[in-house]
Amino acid sequence: VWAGLHALNGNGEMTGSHWVKDAGYFTGPILITNTHSVGAAHEAAVRWMVDTYRDAWENNHLWAMPVVAETYDGVLNDINGLHVRPEHATKALENATSEPPAEGNVGGGAGMICYEFKGGTGTASRRVEAGGKTHTLGVLVQANHGLRPWLKVLGQPVGEKMTDHRIPGFNAERGSIIVIIATDLPLLPSQLDRLARRATIGIGRGGTPGGNNSGDIFLAFSTANEMDLPQLSGPWKSMVSLNDDLLDPVYMAAVEAVEEAVLNAMLAAEDTPTARPSGSVCRAIDAEALKRLFA
């Protein structure tokens, strides 16, 4: 699929990103895991691609460069134990559906922390009117970033008021956020680059400046303009794309959905015991306490 990429702060990894930058597309699934499990997830993605499209791989010289992204979960997970294995990622791929994904403490988000509350996987979406048609834009985040005093919700500095249940020693940014923006709008790779950059505004609304130790990496892709692999296609390609002058509502949809997805990740999360330091608990945000701040 055609794609674009942006890194607000590059202290992280997203495999396949160099080719997205150069060619404007990627092939295969997207996996998001913890920092030390990128290799295991990558192996699973390659195996899944080869097994799923065996005829193409056996009869052509093809190579796999799947997209695998990561954030650091070493506070809540024994990250150095390398407990995520290729078979776990394979099971996730085999069980993938078109149903709305679970949020909070699921998948790669199981061990993530967001603004010193329990973070994880979050989603949000918007409908966008463009060119006389209704299109969809969806966002998935793995939210693992920010310090408590930074947190803002709808522009309100709620983190400064929610000062209880902080993790001991958690006084520096050491997380990251991965943002995936998917749309059926027909967009060129250059337009998808620009769309990916708007995730910066979405997470910025939540309060983060993109800390030095944070890997804030954003990928946008379009399911329009279906394409075959270059090795299996003819000499010419044609594409339909949205007029640049109609992009503003698309940008706003992305900004709003990214902001909402981060909040949804926190609201869906559950309390989780810490691994380092042991004996503490990372609390989920108290939705009722948050609501009272807006009363």
Model region roles, listed by residue range:
Residues 1-295:
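Alpha/propeptide regions of enzymes that mature by internal proteolysis
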